[in-house]
């Protein structure tokens, strides 16, 4: 009878049947071994990419970044005022572009505030209403016309 070999666990199962494989693959040790295998594989891929990028940069195939430090002995061109930085002599300081950075909201919003929307692929919270679908506005059911008042006590009678 053939045996089933698990590459992740480096072991043979007692026999090759779907129930034995299913039981093995749902086990804690097997899942940990699979996770470790792919984690090591990702680390190797990242290191390989870093090594290739470093080698290409050292060979001059990748130009230095435009805002890197200038080579020694060359004059540095000041950045335009729109990029910020300290004001230069004789120049007005640039106005701040925006307020302080927003802190991510932790927990539920304050009472009375509803979240604006949901991220792509996210479900709305329990009890929340689904957003309206785009399309023509819905018709209201017919009602009696409202009475308009021009001044207090002066009501137009309903016709």
Swiss-Prot record:
Q: Which Pfam families match?
A: zf-U1
Has keyword Zinc? yes
Q: Which GO terms describe its biological process?
A: mRNA 5'-splice site recognition; spliceosomal snRNP assembly
Cross-referenced InterPro entries: Matrin/U1-C_Znf_C2H2, Matrin/U1-like-C_Znf_C2H2, U1-CZ_Znf_C2H2, U1_snRNP-C, Znf_C2H2_sf
Supply one GO molecular-function term.
Answer: pre-mRNA 5'-splice site binding
Keywords carried by this UniProt record? Metal-binding, Nucleus, Ribonucleoprotein, RNA-binding, Zinc, Zinc-finger
| Family annotation (SUPFAM superfamilies) | beta-beta-alpha zinc fingers
Q: Does the keyword RNA-binding apply?
A: yes
Q: Which GO terms describe its cellular component?
A: commitment complex; U1 snRNP; U2-type prespliceosome
Zn finger (Matrin-type) start-end: 4-36
Q: Which superkingdom is the protein from?
A: Eukaryota
Extract the ranges annotated as region (Disordered). Answer: 63-95, 139-159
Q: From start to end residue, where is composition biased (Pro residues)?
A: 77-95
Q: Where in the cell is it found?
A: Nucleus
Q: Which family does it belong to?
A: Belongs to the U1 small nuclear ribonucleoprotein C family.
Record PANTHER family = U1 SMALL NUCLEAR RIBONUCLEOPROTEIN C
Purpose of the protein: Component of the spliceosomal U1 snRNP, which is essential for recognition of the pre-mRNA 5' splice-site and the subsequent assembly of the spliceosome. SNRPC/U1-C is directly involved in initial 5' splice-site recognition for both constitutive and regulated alternative splicing. The interaction with the 5' splice-site seems to precede base-pairing between the pre-mRNA and the U1 snRNA. Stimulates commitment or early (E) complex formation by stabilizing the base pairing of the 5' end of the U1 snRNA and the 5' splice-site region.
Q: How does it assemble?
A: Component of the U1 snRNP. The U1 snRNP is composed of the U1 snRNA and the 7 core Sm proteins snrpb, snrpd1, snrpd2, snrpd3, snrpe, snrpf and snrpg that assemble in a heptameric protein ring on the Sm site of the small nuclear RNA to form the core snRNP, and at least 3 U1 snRNP-specific proteins snrnp70/U1-70K, snrpa/U1-A and snrpc/U1-C. snrpc/U1-C interacts with U1 snRNA and the 5' splice-site region of the pre-mRNA.
Q: What is this protein called?
A: U1 small nuclear ribonucleoprotein C
State the organism of origin: Xenopus laevis
């Amino acid at each position: 009878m053939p045996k089933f070999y698990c590459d992740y666990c480096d072991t043979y199962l007692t026999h090759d049947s779907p129930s034995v494989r299913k039981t093995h693959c749902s086990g804690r040790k097997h899942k940990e071994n699979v996770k470790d295998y792919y984690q090591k594989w990702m680390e190797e891929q990242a290191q390989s990419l870093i090594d290739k990028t470093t080698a290409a940069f050292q060979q001059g195939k990748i130009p230095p970044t435009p805002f890197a430090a200038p080579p020694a002995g060359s004059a540095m061109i000041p950045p335009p005022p729109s990029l910020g930085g300290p004001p230069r002599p004789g120049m007005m300081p640039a106005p701040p572009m925006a307020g302080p950075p927003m802190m991510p909201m932790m927990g539920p919003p304050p009472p009375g505030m509803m979240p604006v929307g949901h991220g792509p692929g996210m479900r709305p919270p329990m009890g929340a209403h689904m957003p309206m679908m785009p399309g023509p506005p819905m018709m209201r059911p017919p009602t009696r016309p409202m009475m308009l008042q021009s001044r207090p006590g002066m009501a137009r009678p309903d016709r």
